[in-house]
Amino acid sequence: MAKDDVIEIQGTVTDTLPNAMFKVKLENGAEILAHVSGKIRMHYIRILPGDKVTVELSPYDLTKGRITYRFK
């Protein structure tokens, strides 16, 4: 999948799940499952419930995403 095909949207982490998975409530009200991108994992950036994040969604499956940025 090319980088151009992704949908970027902001949301808030509502719950942490095993294996670095998170439930994220998006700005449009939808709740999705998201995993952490490799760069965030590599730099040991902690993500906790209540954090504002940017999520990349695939146009093919809008229920799963990848967390690419955590706002300070």
UniProtKB/Swiss-Prot annotation:
Subcellular location: Cytoplasm
rRNA-binding among keywords: yes
Highest rank taxon of the organism: Bacteria
MF-aspect GO terms: ribosome binding; rRNA binding; translation initiation factor activity
Coarse class of the protein's main subcellular location: cytoplasm
Protein name, UniProt field: Translation initiation factor IF-1
Record family assignment: Belongs to the IF-1 family.
Domain S1-like positions: 1-72
Alphabetical UniProt keywords: Cytoplasm, Initiation factor, Protein biosynthesis, RNA-binding, rRNA-binding
InterPro entries in alphabetical order: NA-bd_OB-fold, RNA-binding_domain_S1_IF1, S1_domain, TIF_IF1
One Gene Ontology term, aspect cellular component: cytosol
Subunit structure: Component of the 30S ribosomal translation pre-initiation complex which assembles on the 30S ribosome in the order IF-2 and IF-3, IF-1 and N-formylmethionyl-tRNA(fMet); mRNA recruitment can occur at any time during PIC assembly.
Keyword Ubl conjugation: no
Known function: One of the essential components for the initiation of protein synthesis. Stabilizes the binding of IF-2 and IF-3 on the 30S subunit to which N-formylmethionyl-tRNA(fMet) subsequently binds. Helps modulate mRNA selection, yielding the 30S pre-initiation complex (PIC). Upon addition of the 50S ribosomal subunit IF-1, IF-2 and IF-3 are released leaving the mature 70S translation initiation complex.
Pfam families: eIF-1a
